[in-house]
From Swiss-Prot:
Gene: atpH
Membrane topology of this protein: Peripheral membrane protein
Protein name: ATP synthase subunit delta
Cellular location(s): Cell inner membrane
Phylogenetic placement of the source organism: Bacteria, Pseudomonadati, Myxococcota, Myxococcia, Myxococcales
UniProt KW Ion transport keyword: yes
Example of a GO cellular component annotation carried by this entry: plasma membrane
UniProt cross-references to InterPro entries, sorted A to Z: ATP_synth_OSCP/delta_N_sf, ATPase_OSCP/dsu
Native species: Anaeromyxobacter dehalogenans (strain 2CP-C)
Keywords annotated in UniProt: ATP synthesis, Cell inner membrane, Cell membrane, CF(1), Hydrogen ion transport, Ion transport, Membrane, Transport
GO molecular function, one term: proton-transporting ATP synthase activity, rotational mechanism
Coarse class of the protein's main subcellular location: membrane
Highest taxon of the lineage: Bacteria
Length: 179
């Protein structure tokens, strides 16, 4: 709970600045790249969150990371601020909160679409279009693959779940036949 409220404060502060400067989308993209870099490297994650490393060591690594990712000054400053306050572990939550604020600001919804096999671009676009029609908003897809679905897709937009999987259809058929 505490991590969430602290992450929200950092995200809201950076988001307010992004809105002022008209940089919501570029900063959102940069923060996603930063989050992926940190989550994709266990060694980097360890250095950034482990108190065994001095603030100076972490600061040097954060500077190299910001430079390598070509971060603009404000997102880089967020990284430095989190590092200076020993809160780099909050970075994923800050980025996720910023992303949610950006989506809301830009009138977008995120949908998690799970399919039995990877979706090609055309199928993904068709699903996004259908979900956009149903929700009356621009829908961005986060795709996942789960072979247990057997076929079809399951789409989740907020608290709504559209289940068109073969697995669910077979389960429904089995229940009907048992009656």
């Amino acid at each position: 709970m505490l991590m969430g409220s602290i992450a929200r404060r950092y995200a809201r502060a950076l988001f307010s600045l992004a809105v002022e400067q008209g940089r919501v989308e570029p900063w959102n993209d940069a923060l996603q790249v930063l989050k992926n870099a940190v989550e994709g490297s266990p060694d980097l994650r360890d250095v950034l969150s482990n108190p065994v490393y001095s603030k100076e060591q972490r600061r040097a690594i954060v500077e190299k990371l910001a430079s390598a990712l070509k971060l603009e000054r404000e997102p880089a400053n967020l990284l430095f601020l989190l590092g200076d306050r020993n809160r780099l572990a909050y970075l994923p939550a800050v980025v996720d909160t910023f992303r949610a604020l950006a989506d809301q600001h830009l009138g977008r919804l995120r949908a998690r679409v799970t399919s039995a096999v990877p979706l090609d671009a055309q199928a993904a676009q068709a699903i996004a279009d259908r979900l956009s029609q149903a929700t009356k908003a621009t829908v961005l897809l986060d795709r996942a693959v789960d072979p247990a679905l057997l076929g079809g897709v399951v789409a989740q937009v907020g608290s709504l779940v559209y289940d068109g999987s073969l697995r669910t259809q077979l389960e429904d058929l089995r229940k009907t036949l048992k009656q």
